[in-house]
């Protein structure tokens, strides 16, 4: 075998993950090259500061939401088939639920402003404002320059889960979505039903535009029902079997007119693999509701920030 062929073979073979060594006092992903300075402990003892404290963000009117939920009626539903994606629309002031119906199943959620697809969910800022996992009361913020809430979580039957002893939580905004490019990078295999691919096809069908044209619109997701976190030793992204069971749901208020796209992840409950046909997969149900209480709902305005009229 030539060196070139051997090199390609080594590059394309899946890498084996070695169990980490027991962590030291200061956990590290790589063996350090440089010695710690004499004041290392003092430097590491600096106080933690929350980067974006959200307390000044006006909260939703909890009484209004309670009244809306009490009077809501289902007006539509969309079934998302296993290893596929579907789109749905919700008017501002409406509510929608993502429901587990047949078995544990993770869903990858994209949200867009229905009238301007360039305004879409921004997982990074949502994570910075609300943390790594979302639940009741947390909002899903849109991209710059709009930076407004697209949706707010109004109910979550998995809110009891919290964070487990592995550091795992449910409904994360840290994972990007499974995609065929990363799958090929790691395994040299082509798989066409990753959530990225499913979402791209669904948005293409909805808009009537070519898949290659809409692909850049597909963005980092909210991983609905997915149980994830960062390992305690190396801080690597991990997943474990979702605690979701049939009948569980997460519910949202649409703060603007929304286009949603949801993929039923090929990983099923994501307790093992996520980019193959190996896992048992189940459909997800999207239920759309309206409430007369919300008929006068005013969508959240875009950011009031304005660039200066002259150079600064």
Task: Map each language-model feature to its residues.
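Acidic, Ser/Thr/Pro
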Residues: 25-312
């Amino acid at each position: 075998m030539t060196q070139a062929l051997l090199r390609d073979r080594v590059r394309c073979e899946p890498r084996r993950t070695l169990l980490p060594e027991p962590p030291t006092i200061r956990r590290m992903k790589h063996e350090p090259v440089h010695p710690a300075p004499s004041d290392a402990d003092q430097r590491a003892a600096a106080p933690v500061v929350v980067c974006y404290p959200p307390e000044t963000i006006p909260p939703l009117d909890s009484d209004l939401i309670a009244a809306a939920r009490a009077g809501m009626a289902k007006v539509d539903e969309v079934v998302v088939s296993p290893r596929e994606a579907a789109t749905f629309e919700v008017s501002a002031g409406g509510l929608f639920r993502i429901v587990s119906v047949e078995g544990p199943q993770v869903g990858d959620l994209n949200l867009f402003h229905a009238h301007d697809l360039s305004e879409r969910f921004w997982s990074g800022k949502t994570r910075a404002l609300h943390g790594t996992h979302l639940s009741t009361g947390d909002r899903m913020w849109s991209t710059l320059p709009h930076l407004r809430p697209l949706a707010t979580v109004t109910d979550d039957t998995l809110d009891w889960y919290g964070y487990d002893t592995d550091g795992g939580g449910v409904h994360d905004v840290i994972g990007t979505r499974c995609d065929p490019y990363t799958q090929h990078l790691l395994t040299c295999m082509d798989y066409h039903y990753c959530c990225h691919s499913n979402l791209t096809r669904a948005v293409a069908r909805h808009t009537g535009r070519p898949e290659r044209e809409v692909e850049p619109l597909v963005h980092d997701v909210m991983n609905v029902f997915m149980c994830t976190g960062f390992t305690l030793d190396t801080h690597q992204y991990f997943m474990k079997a979702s605690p979701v069971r049939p009948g569980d749901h997460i519910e949202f208020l649409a703060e603007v007119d929304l286009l949603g796209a949801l993929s039923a992840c090929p990983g099923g409950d994501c307790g093992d693999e996520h980019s193959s046909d190996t896992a048992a997969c189940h459909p997800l149900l999207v239920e759309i509701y309206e409430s007369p209480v919300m008929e006068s709902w005013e969508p959240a305005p875009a950011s009031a920030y304005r660039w200066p009229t002259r150079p600064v």
